[in-house]
Structure formats: structure tokens, C-alpha cells
Amino acid sequence: MGCFGRTPKSNKRSDTKTTKNNDFTPKKLTVNANRDKLTQPSSDCLKVSICGDVSKEIVTKKDQLALDAKDTNVEDEVIVKKAQTFTFEELSVSTGNFKSDCFLGEGGFGKVYKGFIEKINQVVAIKQLDRNGAQGIREFVVEVLTLSLADHPNLVKLIGFCAEGVQRLLVYEYMPLGSLDNHLHDLPSGKNPLAWNTRMKIAAGAARGLEYLHDTMKPPVIYRDLKCSNILIDEGYHAKLSDFGLAKVGPRGSETHVSTRVMGTYGYCAPDYALTGQLTFKSDVYSFGVVLLELITGRKAYDNTRTRNHQSLVEWANPLFKDRKNFKKMVDPLLEGDYPVRGLYQALAIAAMCVQEQPSMRPVIADVVMALDHLASSKYDRSHRQKQDNVTETKVDEEKTLTTESNVCVEEKQEIKICSDQAT
């Protein structure tokens, strides 16, 4: 495709060829309207892995509800150092007892509210985890650990948490522009669509956050739940990854993958991971490719309101990737032609490589970042496009004029020849 430069550092992850497992077939991947996760962990027990092999514990669902902050047992008290602890009363007061006016949204693991905490003088987003789900407890532990160890401008900042009795709450920095999903899909009347430049900026920011998880975090982390609703937008359309409850420590040393239960969101899950349960860094790259396609096309990763062959974004796009003549048909119609054709071709080439069926054919995220940084820095100006169009139209007019003049000259020559013959 020619859009990927080579990174100076050797950071390519090795991937194994995946084979079908009889225990995991596509039939198990069903869409649940009430919850967008593909599968749920067993309600009998749950393995909570902290910082890879630092600490592992098996807890029953009943025991999980009794966990307190001290029970997370984090090495070197990293949580205490980097994340504040809040009482449930403090967070309740900050949201007006979680009143509806403060409600921001709801995800697979709980509800999110906007609040103001006086003791830190800051507006925050507070996620109250679902107390009835074993998944929510695991998410709480993993997310606190991941964000306590992470430090990157393209990852949402964890301010603190509350683990009091049966209550589990996470406190984040507040993102005033909501999620990417709010800006791409089902736009309310009068809301302007994202400009091309903004879309590429968001894509590059999300890719940088993913690159940090894969290549800088120690140990490296596989995000496992990259989707538009988990990309939050700060002022200036600065993208930040959020919701790390499904994150897993990636393969290390000679390992090529992590074997795990398949979890994620339908439409974003890599086919190799869905079939085998073998999770790799390339699984995240596939999910990123789906997000990039959403940014380019304006379509949802999975839309059951469309005809059967067009419900899956990747299945719809794959046949169109084969011929560049189709590329303009793929762009979001809300852009109304306001995009650079060359930039569109390059962005679609990147997306096409990311959603390759075989993980070995997908690029590493560092190469994706390099390509998208170039696209994001190439500012598109509509007036420049109009000038280009005017130049093209002028050339066409000139060619038509030259053709017409040439025809006139031929006709004049023929008339002269006829007159000459008659005179003779």
C-alpha cells in the first residue's frame, strides 16, 4: 500500500498463525442488545491478574463484593501513590446524589456521572460500576491498575477511586466533548459533522495511545476493547483512550499470544481472536482499523438496520478496497466532498491493512502512527481544493478550445482547397 514508513526501533510483535478451535466457533459470537460484550466470565469464579504475575487471586462472586481498596494488593502501593481515594459520601455529594442532571451515559459496566469535587476543586467524570456483575469488579481492579501505571496524553487520566463496602467507583478527568461515537453516529439535527482534518487528528491521537500501551508500558498491555465509544474527546478534539477493564498483559519473551476468553465488542473484534481465543497486539490493530473506517465512512462498525451484506462495516468495505475507483463511494456523505482525494486514498489504504484477516498481514501500531501523523499534519484547505478544481476545469476548457480551434483550422483549410480546385 506504500503508506507505512519503517520505524527506526525494532518493535514489531511476532504473531502466530491461528487455527480454528472446536471450543470457539463464530456461532458463539451473538449480538446481545442489552450488553455489547461478546461473552461474559463465569459467575462462579473470576481470576484477577494484577500487573501480570505480580499477584493473582481467585475470588468467588460473593467475596468480590466484600473487596476493599486494601484488598487490591498492588505492588509498591502504586495505586496509593498515583490515584486518590475518595469516600462514597464525597462522590455522592459531588454528583448531587447521582441525580439525573449529572448523568453522562452508560456503558457495559456501569453509569457515568459528571461531578465537582470540592477538595480538589475539579470537575470530574465518575463511573459507578454495576454491583450485580462479577465483570464489573474485575474491570474495577484492572482499570485502576492499568491507569495507575500509565502516563500518556492520549490516555484518560485516572484521578482516583472509591472501594467502600459494595460500592466501586472510578474518578476520571472530565472530557467536555464526550466520546467519538457522539460525533460520528446518529447526529442530532443541526450538529455539524467532524471535518476531515479533525477526523485524522483523532485517529492519530488514538493510535498514539495504543502505541504507548503496546510499546512503552512495562509490561506491555493489549487494550482489547478499542471502539468509538471508548475514545473520549477533550477540548481541541484531543483524543484519549478510556475504559481499560478488559485490558490484558501482552505476550512477553518467546510468547506469541495470550490465550483468554473472547471478550470485546461485536464488529470490532479481530476474526483470529474471535475464532481461537488467541489474543495478540495485532488484535488491537484490527479494532483500530475498524475505528479508522468509521471515521472515514461515517458508518457504524455493526449496524443491524442495514441490509444483511452491509451490516458489518469490514464485510461491506472489503470488496470495495480492491479497486480505487470505489474509494470515493466509501467516504462519509456528510463531508459533502470536503476532503483531499489523496488523503482519502492513503487513509483507506491504512485501514485496509489494519483489517486484514491474517494478523501477520497487519502493520504494527508504530507504523500506523507514523502514517497517520503524516496525514494529520497535512492540513486540508477547502479553498485549495477549489483552486485545484478550477485549475482542472481551466485545463479542460483549454483543451476543448484547442480542439475546437483545430477543427476550425481544418475546415478553413478544406474550404481553401475547394476554392483552389474550383479556380483551377
Swiss-Prot record:
Q: Which residues carry this modification: Phosphotyrosine?
A: 172, 273
Q: Does the keyword Ubl conjugation apply?
A: no
GO biological process terms on file = defense response
Lipidation (N-myristoyl glycine) occurs at 2
How does this protein lie in the membrane?
Answer: Lipid-anchor
Name of the protein this chain belongs to = Probable serine/threonine-protein kinase PBL6
The residues responsible for catalysis, as annotated, are 225
One CC-aspect GO term: plasma membrane
Query: Is RNA-binding included in the keywords of this UniProt record?
Result: no
Q: What class of enzyme is it?
A: transferase
